[in-house]
């Protein structure tokens, strides 16, 4: 009988974390939950603890951790260790009982614990884009150095991975994008978009930050940068195609004219199950795709005037240096301001563009350089935010 594989889920209370737990719970003979981490959703984390009984839980803030300790004590789960803070996050990722790490913390906060998993030689399921956007060269160097198995979880990159084979004869990859909730809106209506409207994605269930990124198409821009590092292709061989139905998750075109596509219902449990089982397959709980009765599949080129964030991401990738680190930091600041009602939707791109225009740092040699550039870019973005932010009308 095979031993179960110990798994740590970084970002367990987020949408990817919950989908991972759903898949894992279908295969109790294969997995055991060793560690879970979360940000501030104490009640949700307590419920996960009652369902999955991890050895360790890490919350971002000490207050949340203390609340959780009390709640677990009341529930008779005092044996579960509860910690807080960045170092505890990293420790969860490198625990001796952990074999595999689902890296699903959103944003720059996911970089250090994911690197900790890599340096500890764990198998890493990468759902955090920012590791590659902020520190692509350094991150992939560590992956090679520690001979780590790195499997992509983003539906687009997972689709490319499934179609990529050995990478021989690839002409280009085509990342598909839904176009978000505002693809067909009249341009004048975009000026008064609210956070709730931006977070209402037509096809996918996602967190608020990534939903806004989808609405601006910055999400696809970050995925272009991620694809560059994962598949070692220049920007000129990575294209984006709008596909509103989100049935084809991405395509790979070969020099002989063949185009391989991966299809499936828009449910993150599919790429998660693919990665968890690779090179085998496992049941995910996702329903079969019904092509006969499903929607017609449509495609269109993205309008870069309508989606300037996508153009900014391509520019940052081609500029090289630390431009992608600056892009990511400025976008996180701008999106948070929009979600809090301090910045109009259409000014998100302006904050990012102005920050990119002011900072052109060289490529970082060390992780400390990445973190310093990230911090500087946030400070510059906040200054531009003060100029562009006028609140929501």
Swiss-Prot record:
GO terms for biological process: isopentenyl diphosphate biosynthetic process, methylerythritol 4-phosphate pathway involved in terpenoid biosynthetic process. NADPH binds at residues 13-16, 128, 130, 207. InterPro entries: DXP_reductoisomerase, DXP_reductoisomerase_C, DXP_reductoisomerase_N, DXPR_C, DXPR_C_sf, NAD(P)-bd_dom_sf. This is 1-deoxy-D-xylulose 5-phosphate reductoisomerase. SUPFAM superfamilies: 1-deoxy-D-xylulose-5-phosphate reductoisomerase, C-terminal domain (SSF69055), Glyceraldehyde-3-phosphate dehydrogenase-like, C-terminal domain (SSF55347), NAD(P)-binding Rossmann-fold domains (SSF51735). Belongs to the DXR family. The gene is dxr. Catalyzes the NADPH-dependent rearrangement and reduction of 1-deoxy-D-xylulose-5-phosphate (DXP) to 2-C-methyl-D-erythritol 4-phosphate (MEP). The lineage of its organism: Bacteria, Pseudomonadati, Pseudomonadota, Acidithiobacillia, Acidithiobacillales. It catalyses: 2-C-methyl-D-erythritol 4-phosphate + NADP(+) = 1-deoxy-D-xylulose 5-phosphate + NADPH + H(+). The keyword Oxidoreductase applies.
